[in-house]
Regions:
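Histidine-centered catalytic micro-motifs
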Residues: 53-58, 168-175
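Active-site-proximal alpha-helix that buttresses catalytic centers in soluble enzyme cores
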Residues: 16, 22-130, 135-139, 181-214
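Generic beta-sheet signal
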Residues: 48-50, 161-170
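A short, structured loop/turn motif at beta-sheet edges
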Residues: 158-163, 195-196
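A short, acidic, amphipathic alpha-helical segment used as a generic capping/interface helix at domain edges
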Residues: 148-160
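Short alpha-helical segments and helix-capping/turn motifs at coil-helix boundaries
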Residues: 35-38, 152-153, 176
């Protein structure tokens, strides 16, 4: 884990779980999709899933959480969505509307790129939750990773409102802390099926451009 840079804390390049059967040690599941894309839409239209997005593409990719000048109250001090990221957000929202995917809660981090992705895609967000934030370090210790896992796990394992899907728009490192999967590229979504208790099952992953073709 290394602050949205895709590198691990020991300086080596992070694993590339998006295309491999990577073991997710935090929950003991494999990241291989367990459902065909052709049936994914029908499943999520029934509700009951957590859809975790990493925010869409930014102009630059660096660990701004470690910048002492960064303020969560000042968007100008943070990474900004790029033209591509703005387009991705709009297209995700249009696909959800066109395919009538039911959305209940929309939970975002306190970072501007997170809630702006939500505003562009869905026109709103329900709740800002600091548990989705980065810890203010570029490199994380084992205790930092455990803290992020403790913070985020309840959000991923709690069932959504009946007949809806819960959308979470967050960041890479907190998601990796819980699942062992580095969410790449920016804008990728993971479909999770919570057990209503302390865990969940990873169902599939969807790239920003794939929502329109489900």
């Amino acid at each position: 884990l290394n602050g949205e840079t895709g590198a691990s804390s020991n300086g080596s390049k992070a694993e590339a779980p998006a295309d491999q059967k990577t073991k997710t040690p935090a929950i003991g599941l494999t990241s291989e999709p367990s459902i065909e894309k052709s049936t994914l839409l029908a499943s999520i239209k029934n509700g009951g899933y957590i859809i975790y997005f990493r925010h869409t593409t930014t102009e630059r990719d660096y660990a701004d959480q470690a910048d002492p000048l960064m303020s969560l109250d000042d968007c100008s001090s943070q990474r900004k969505l790029s033209t591509q990221g703005i387009k991705e957000s709009y297209e995700i929202g249009m696909a959800f509307a066109a395919k009538e995917i039911p959305v209940g809660e929309i939970i975002v981090s306190e970072y501007c790129r997170s809630w702006k992705t939500a505003n562009l895609a869905f026109g709103e967000w329900t709740q800002k939750d600091s548990r989705l934030n980065f810890l203010p370090y570029e490199d994380y210790t084992k205790s930092h990773v455990e803290l992020m896992k403790k913070n985020v796990m309840p959000l991923l394992s709690r069932a959504p409102l009946p007949g809806t899907n819960k959308v979470i728009i967050g960041h890479d490192d907190p998601f990796e802390a819980v699942t062992g999967i580095y969410p790449e590229p920016q804008g990728i979504a993971y479909i999770l099926q919570p057990d209503g208790g302390k865990s969940f099952k990873i169902i599939d992953r969807v790239l920003p451009s794939e929502w329109a073709t489900l």
